[in-house]
Amino acid sequence: MKKRSADLESLWKSVSPGAETFDPHALPDLPESVRAYLTHAIAAGAPLASAVRLRMHGTIKLGRWRKFKAQQVIVRQRGMIWHARLRIGGLSVRGEDRFLDGEGAMRWNLARIIPLMRASGPDITRSAAGRAAAESIWLPSILCSDDVWWRAGEGNTVHARFAVDGQAADLALAVAQGRLHAVSLPRWGNPDGGPFREVPFGAFVDQEATFDGYTIPARLRVGWYFDDVARFDREGKFFEVSIDEAIFR
């Protein structure tokens, strides 16, 4: 795991702080609900970050619910690396999920050295790209880019369409008075162990917090079957997370 830990550090160190700042008056002609979301998420004058480093804790469903702590680095136009630590049967387990430079992978080790799970290939990469798209809500400066196409949806929903390493993503964001309440998208996956296909995936945002001029989701419930709340609660939800720290660069 040492090499992969260095990868997270090197990914973070590869980014230099940018000089451009957020000017709400410079936003293009957008639906009012989109403008309200972006100006709520990013304070006027805040640097337009190209990366964020997150420290988090929560519970993850691996057989049963287990506590974890993790760090994650997200970099615009490159992807993300997520490192987690938890315990199973009293033994330390370390996991890594990544989508970086067009390739996705998952690796979990017991006691640092015994492989528990390895996964990669086209299906994993496509699924990881969907995760990276959804997690743009933790780096909302991504959504200010000129290559994001916004449109208003039904009710309080707005849609952001953009590409993640050439793969189209269509995020649905439920926004009320600028605050994000949920995010969802069709994500490639096989949560039931069957063939990979597009499955509704998303997160409910229960709390937000402000770090360095960015107001981002700080407590979330994440899972599959997002179009069916009962099924989401019963079998789709697999991740509950709280953000402890966010550093933008």
Question: Language-model segments: what does each one mean?
Answer:
Residues 86-91, 109-116, 185-190, 222-227:
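Short, solvent-exposed aromatic-acidic interface loops
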